Amino acid sequence: MLTYLVFILAIAAIYALLAQSLVLVWGQTGMVNLGLVGFFAIGAYASALLTRNAGLPAFSGPVIGLLAGAAVGLVITLSTLRLRDDYLAIVTLGFAEVVRIVASNEIWLTGGTDGISGIPSLFSRTGGLTFHLQFMALATGLCLVAGLVITRLVRSPWGRVLRAIRDDQVVASVAGKKVVRFKAQAFMIGAGIAGLAGALYGSYISYIAPDLFLPLITIYVFLAATAGGNTRAIGATAGAYLLVAWLEASRFLGEVVPGVSAVQVASLREITVGLALVLVLRFAPGGLFRERNEKAPQT
């Protein structure tokens, strides 16, 4: 039981990283990245291929995932940042599906639908509970570091420019701010964090396949960020932990509700997630941790 709880905490920390990746992109800049799971997959596959096939050390996996996600994020931003918000959302959603389809069909590289197994781990798997505790501590520590960095960026002059772009892009441009450059920087940082999460995920479970990177993951992460507050790292983190707690608790609905099959339980989980999103948007649109109003500078 303890091993299971530690495993859930480790997965929650990875989801928290994914939710944090939306803070700068969505919460601060106003860009809707529906291709989040694509960057998650890019980080996982890049890390797995270079540590398992190319023989790079396992500890380089998170760095590889971070750099791969950031690099692909930069390419996407340079291609799409001049699009309106709704078109950007559509393009990024399509990007995530392209990544999944390529991973499914390029068998020579990704193993196709069979995926990649035997991914080197950062810690010895023979340790049992110790292995899970070590990985949980690492994932939680990286989550805290990412949260602190994001918080510092949000409170910096750079973060204020992002909010100016979010509130009125034209005014920010007229004020002399290079909108495209700031958007590209925010998107690249967010994509890098998502890639880092993917590398950690692959290393932890030692196996990745296209079916693990469905669009549903993006929906879950957006729900987590919405519930906790998409403008603050602490809100995104809290939302991710609440989401994972509910997803795991709802697995046992079949034991609570009589006459419900396993298939029906899975359907009920998705219904409750959708209902939770509607309720959050209705009663707490700013999330549990709303954006703080900045005080005007005193003269």
Where are these regions (language model features)?
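Transmembrane alpha-helices and adjacent helix-loop boundaries
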Residues: 2-299
